[in-house]
Amino acid sequence: MSRTASYAGMTTPVKDKEGHGIPCLQPIDVVECTYQYFTKSQNKLSLRVGDLIYVLTKGSNGWWDGVLIRHSANNNNNSLILDRGWFPPSFTRSILNELHGVPEIGNELEIFQAGLNLKLELSSNPVILSLEDFLDCCRDIEFKEQLAWSPIPVHERKGCCELLYYNQDLDVYCRTLPYLPQNQVETVNDYSSFPAISKIAGKKMPITSSPDLFYLNDCDVVYWYDLTRLVCHYVNLTERDLLANEREKFLTSLDLLTAQITYVYMLFRNLRLVEDSFKKTLKKLIYTLSRFSINANIWFHSTPFEEREAIASQKDPERRSPLLQSILGTFQKFHFLLRLLHFLSNPNELTILPQLTPRFFKDSFNTISWNNPFLRKHLNQHMSHDLPRQMIKAVAGASGIVAENNDEIPASKQGTSCSSETSHHSPSAPFQRRRRGTIFSNVPGSSDESDTIWSKRKKPYPLNEETLSLVRARKEQLDAKLKQMIKSANEYLSNTANFSKMLNSEMNFKTYEEVSGTIPIIDILENLDLTIYLNLRELGDENRVFDEDVAIDDEDKEFLKHSLSSLSYILSDYFNMKQYFHDVVVKFIIVAQHLTLEDPFVFSPMQNDLPTGYYEPMKPSSLNLDNAKDKKNGSQNTDIQEEEDEYEPDPDSLILFHNLINQDSDFNDLKFFNLAHVFKKSCDDYFDVLKLSIEFVNRLILERENLLNYAARMMKNNITELLLRGEEGYGSYDGGETAEKSDTNAVYADSDTKDNDEWRDSQVKLPRYLQREYDSELIWGSNNRIKGGSKHALISYLTDNEKKDLFFNITFLITFRSIFTTTEFLSYLISQYNLDPPEDLCFEEYNEWVTKKLIPVKCRVVEIMTTFFKQYWFPGYDEPDLATLNLDYFAQVAIKENITGSVELLKEVNQKFKHGNMQEATAPMKTLDQQICQEHYWGTLYSTTESILAVDPVLFATQLTILEHEIYCEITIFDCLQKIWKNKYTKSYGASPGLNEFISFANKLTNFISYSIVKEADKSKRAKLLSHFIFIAEYCRKFNNFSSMTAIISALYSSPIYRLEKTWQAVIPQTRDLLQSLDKLMDPKKNFIDYRSELKSLHSAPCVPFFGVYLSDLTFTDSGNPDYLVLEHGLKGVHDEKKYINFNKRSRLVDILQEIIYFKKTHYDFTKDRTVIECISNSLENIPHIEKQYQLSLIIEPKPRKKVVPNSNSNNKSQEKSRDDQTDEGKTSTKKDRFSKFQLHKTKKKAPKVSK
């Protein structure tokens, strides 16, 4: 790459298309060659003495990128030869700074040259091109990337107003900001782009100390600049301590300096800077440091302290001791070699260093000793390997394997195995052999869960009372043994003469027996089912993209976000408790082993006095001159100070301790301690952590119930379904209650179901041509209901001429859309209408078949189709393909054949498909009262406290019941099916207007009640409002209006209202007890068992049920049961999972819909007050959401200290349950203090503890 250019030619600066100057191709330095350098490489420059090189980039690996300016061989032609390439800076010197009067670098080079006795013959008057000439020469050179921007200083001009940019590091003002290359970071971090380190297969690459790759300490040295500062810091510190005559500080500083030089040596090895110049300089550097260390130790040991003090205080260097001058001379040579090494390597100060210290890879270690399902779920969603992809690439590069794309990165040995035939990204065989032998043969899998026996449990323990009972039962078994051990320790403390090695061995054996009995508790803690919290975290992710069938509005997102923030600290404490459990058990075992030792300090020499990471390179900003020595023992002293007052002083130990100190001038600060004291303390901690585990399991169970309870009360069944998705046992439906329904509540009576067995027996006696063809493909349940069957069998049973199963027919017509499309269903019916006769029938048998089977089946088909169009047709069932069936022609054919009901069928078909008036025909008529209520929309609002309190609670509850029952009556079975099916079976359902209006009204009522309280500034009025709404809720219960009652309870237990401590104190206890009884009725424990019992006892009384229970039942039944039955033995030898429809699932859905429809039949006989109803309806609009209400709550009662609230509530029962557990299990105030010491980020190495 060269060209000839005119030496004197002047050009204008490079401009872009808009005419603006671009500061590209600007050299950052100009150097002159001082030594000859020849190379055959095309991308490197060959240098001769006197050549001028314009430096464009200073590489971090010791190679610079520059443009060489050389005179042409033809002297008659005033021209230059330009070449661009890499060159070693050690063969050049900088001349640009000398011309600008900055001699620092030149002076240092002169020192180097004088020390090496070099004689240079350089040009005395080098000619440097101007920027314009340089740009003119380089205009035609093609560069692969834009070069780094160099700041152009702005000279001070008076009276000039312009925008300037200041760079603090360079101390320069500029008019423009830098043009950063797009791959600037990669250029700094990528060592493979320079000649010294080539990215060749088999060439090992260093693993960079990237924050994205490792869990780094805040003070870790990451950049070359940090390492340079660190070494200089310890060099200065060592020299200062030597001259200050401080022996201990000097030894400490010298020790740390030696460690840093070791890291520098490791750095050069990792960067493959192994040329002779580097090796010789490193060897001289280490040799000089060792001489300095030996001479300094001789100086401190051979010279008395006073003499050293006098010599060190001399300011005149010539009057110092020859030995000290020799030591300082050796240290100055060490200085020189260190700077020389730096100039030889000439690194980029922003270069990221290789990883020099052991650190954990990110996403491969979760810093705890237990299973972390949150980390495992995160990894499974974001990567196909069970090891982080960046970790695999880094380890592969360090092993000499280069993967051009992610598909070539091998998975770890714990990944799922697949055959070579099915693998789409299978590496070559040599690569596979090399991978197994080099990288991952010793790399473990992700440590997101511990490799223990109990971590292999297949089914997790559910968060329920049964699991809590297991933990409590196991703890009670351990308590008896533990109390006996504590008793033995107390007896020993009371009489030390009873010391016996046999007794200690026995206690050691009991300890192991006790710990082995803890395994069931560890099993439960390790395998708790936290699926609901995992789903909550995923749903609360702001960047999550939901599927089309998941309907989550802004209100739901706010609820999920609020729930996640309120529960996160509980989960964090739970995992901290598990780590604390681990620490206590380990300490318990160690202390028990300690009992068997005759000398408790026998292992003390094995203990490292230095804290972890003492010799690791740390940023100098974390050190100062005062704590350089204290860093050595700071961690240990801190731990001793934390526990120095935990044991009672032992007089005998103190006397012996002081006597030994008086006899010895040197001691290690270790104190004597009583083994029984330590063992008793470990027993107490072990006893407390067992209580703590029960408490946290209980908290997780209660918080799960509270979360589901709130979602159920707000009728957010979609949120409930998403939260419980994937949980063990999710969706289990207990059909016992449905089967036990009273006959009074039964809507679809079926008197024939009792005779099903006799009827099936009678079918066997019929001739073969009259028997049903698909009867063998029907599956019957124990309650004489169809449990499942094939599509043909279900259609055949639906149109059976002898058996009319009314419940089956209604269930089929309501839920058919989950089995067939509309076109498919009607096609099956038409095919059933046109039955083909069996083969080999004689004339008499054929006539009997037509008379006894064909004609009755045709009548049944017409009857079913008429009933379907008349009572169960929904506009969303319409499909384009229905026109191909010619239903009107089918009805006309049935009329010609004189089939009963065919005329009515034709009428329904014409009404549904020709007149296009389907919605008006099926929509219920609105009552006159509803129309009047909608016409008079604008009315008085309950906008003030006085207006609300002025309404009698009985009147308010009465009119609220009338209004909500009318809305409830608008709910249809199609609204319910659409709510749970969404777009699962069809996308033409549309919204659920009736059900959505009912849910919206209940939620608006909740917001209205809570807002009415928080907007009132006066405490006494707020208390009156609380009592007023509690009385309204009680009357709603008397009127069987459980929907409004639940809405009021939810408002009073919402976070903005519940935290009003002073307001709740003003409510009389009797009123709070009343609220407690209402809340207990709606307790979600055992699937709202109290509420369901209350609802079942109503018989024929009018009622507005709480619809959240129905939504939960519908959701769990639909999502928790499969659409198809899986049989162990297929019928007729056929094993087809999708062949047998799970009709029992559809029957359960209809059972729930049956109860919903039942409560629509009986109406209230209350007198309607249109004014009150109108005011209630209008007051529910435009209410601020819960977040705004919470802000108002903080304003009226800021910073609550202690929650004094109603006696019980569902949203905050965890606190009351926690208080109950503390009463039952004893006070555990001290365990929380101990637990706080074992936070993950505060865990420290414990030193031996003694008594004073």
From Swiss-Prot:
InterPro entries: Ras-like_GEF (IPR008937), Ras-like_Gua-exchang_fac_N (IPR000651), Ras_G-nucl-exch_fac_CS (IPR019804), Ras_GEF_dom_sf (IPR023578), RASGEF_cat_dom (IPR001895), RASGEF_cat_dom_sf (IPR036964), SH3-like_dom_sf (IPR036028), SH3_domain (IPR001452). Residues 409-454, 623-648, 1201-1252 are annotated as: Disordered. Keywords: Cell cycle, Cell division, Guanine-nucleotide releasing factor, SH3 domain. SUPFAM superfamilies: Ras GEF, SH3-domain. The keyword Plastid does not apply. Residues 782-914 form the N-terminal Ras-GEF domain. The keyword Cell cycle applies. Coiled coil: none annotated. Residues 952-1199 form the Ras-GEF domain. One of its GO terms (cellular component) is plasma membrane. Residues 26-97 form the SH3 domain. Signal peptide: none annotated. Residues 1239-1252 have a biased composition (Basic residues). One of its GO terms (molecular function) is guanyl-nucleotide exchange factor activity. One of its GO terms (biological process) is Ras protein signal transduction. Residues 416-428 have a biased composition (Low complexity). Residues 1214-1236 have a biased composition (Basic and acidic residues). Promotes the exchange of Ras-bound GDP by GTP. Suppresses the CDC25-5 mutation in yeast (restores cAMP level) and has similar functions as CDC25. This is Guanine nucleotide exchange factor SDC25. It comes from Saccharomyces cerevisiae (strain Lalvin EC1118 / Prise de mousse). The lineage of its organism: Eukaryota, Fungi, Dikarya, Ascomycota, Saccharomycotina.
